[in-house]
Each structure stands twice: as structure tokens, then as C-alpha cells.
Amino acid sequence: MNICLLGNNLTNLVLANILLKKKINVDIISQAKPSLLTNTVRTIAISNENYKFLKENIKGISNLGWPTEKIKIYSDKNKSSELFEFKNNNQKNFYLLKYSALYNLMKKNKFLKFIKLKNYNLDVIRKRNYDLIINSEQNNPITKKYFQKKIEKNYKSLAHTAIIDHKKIENKIATQIFTKKGPIAFLPLSNNQTSIVFSNNSTKLMDKLSLLQIINKYNHQYKINKISDVESVG
């Protein structure tokens, strides 16, 4: 049996793993080049309960997630005292992992193929003679054509993400600051790496230097050694 999953999101990666255990061939089709997925700086936040489920069903994933014990929320007006603090007693709030690490783990399975289709439409995919096609991607052309309203609103906003390498510290508290230009989040990946997500009212991706300037303005704990390339998320 051959099954096609549309989109390289977490839902499809988990579903693919379950299908592969049943000896079903799976293709994951998207508009992203597989080479880009190998090196992407995208990260995935997973709740404590969902991470337990993934560890039970995906071999090797237990070494990929980094635990976060608290989430602290700040405002631009008062950076020294948090507005809110979220924590779960005796358990982690969530786990953060690199999408590239999960992708590289999954692609080791010889029955799973990641395919980029330039002509991304249902007629082209049907010609590949799959027994079943599953679409769980929100913004691909097929979803927009068949499942969404024709009127689309452009809110002129973009989320910029990057990973910073920094001096080793105890790094298990996520922070988000609501600034005048938009919210910025510091999401721990390890004791020496942190994911940055900054959202603003723009349709143009920020360059590395511009994002670093924003980071430095609101960063009070990391001694940064390096910043990755910037990607958009959403």
C-alpha cells in the first residue's frame, strides 16, 4: 500500500511513523526542497503529555527534546518584573526540539520518501497512483482551493526565527517580551543554544544583523557567540 501525506508538519511526521510501523510505504509531499529541511532553523514546541506520546512511538526522539520548566511573560515597559509566570509543579511545561533533528531522524527509514513537487496540485498528485492521499497542511494550494474561503486577508505580519549560540548557562526558562514593535520569544534548545522568534508588522524577512539588534536590546542573560540565518515561520 502506498500513502501520500501532504505537508512536512509535525502531524504528518508522526502519522508517517505510525504507518511505517505497519509496513506501509509513505511519501511526504511538500513545496520545500528536502535539502532545506535538513538545515532549517525551525523549531517545534511540544507539550509534556504529547512528548511522552512521541517517545513511546518514535524511536530516538527522547534525545532530541529540551525541557522547559517555566514560561515568563514581560512587557516593554517593565523588563525586570514578569507579568505572568507559567509552570507545572513537578513536571515540564513543554519540550522544544529542532525540526531538522526530527526530519533527519525520520528520513533514516528507507520506506519514507520526502518529495518536492513544483506543480503542487491535486491532479498532478493523483497521477502518482497513491492508494490514499491525506492533506493536513493548512496553507498549501490544495487546501486554499477546496477548503478555504476565496477572500484572503493580508495582515502584513511576519514571524522571523533564528537560533543563537551562546555561552553555556542553565537554560530551562522560556521568556516572551511584548515590545512596541512586536513580541519576541527566547525558547531554550540546550544550555548553549536558544531559538528566537520575533513577530512584527512586516512582509519582508529581516536580515541577520537587524534581528540581532532586536535580540540584543531585550537579551539580558545570553552572551551570544553566533546567530544563524533568519527564516520565516507561520
Question: What are these model-predicted stretches?
Answer:
Residues K204-G234:
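FAD/FMN-dependent oxidoreductases across multiple families
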Residues N48, T143-G182, S190-T194, I215-H220, ...:
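Central beta-strand plus flanking loop segment that forms part of the substrate or channel wall
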Residues E56, W66-H160:
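Conserved N-terminal helical subregion
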Residues T38-I73:
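N-terminal FAD cofactor-binding segment of flavoenzymes
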Residues F186:
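An acidic/histidine-cluster motif and surrounding catalytic segment
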Residues C4-N8, I18-V41:
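Glycine-rich FAD pyrophosphate-binding loop
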Residues G7, S30, S75, I164, ...:
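Short beta-strand/turn micro-motifs composed of small residues
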Residues N12-L13:
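N-terminal Rossmann-fold NAD(P) dinucleotide-binding loop
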